């Protein structure tokens, strides 16, 4: 997900996306602990997506 895709969304859409990504990050961390995660790089990608969404939210303020 790129910042250009995110910046045109409304605050409500961004909040929903942020919540979904945080839930996804939580489940990925659980899978990592139980050795079920096949690609650990997914965690860093989701964390970067969360940072991009937070940047877009702060830009709206």
From Swiss-Prot:
List the SUPFAM superfamilies: Ribosomal protein L29 (L29p) (SSF46561)
What are the recorded Gene Ontology BP terms?
translation
The similarity annotation says: Belongs to the universal ribosomal protein uL29 family.
An MF annotation (GO) of this entry: structural constituent of ribosome
* Gene3D superfamilies linked: 1.10.287.310
GO CC aspect terms: ribonucleoprotein complex; ribosome
Q: Which residues cross the membrane?
A: none
Pfam families in UniProt: Ribosomal_L29 (PF00831)
Which UniProt key words apply to this protein?
Ribonucleoprotein, Ribosomal protein
Q: What is the protein's given name?
A: Large ribosomal subunit protein uL29
Question: Can you name the source organism?
Answer: Campylobacter lari (strain RM2100 / D67 / ATCC BAA-1060)
């Amino acid at each position: 997900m790129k910042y250009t895709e995110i910046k045109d969304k409304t605050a409500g859409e961004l909040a929903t996306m942020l919540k979904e990504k945080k839930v996804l990050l939580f489940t990925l961390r659980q899978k990592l602990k139980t050795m079920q995660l096949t690609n650990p790089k997914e965690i860093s990608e989701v964390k970067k997506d969360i940072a991009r969404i937070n940047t877009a939210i702060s830009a709206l303020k």
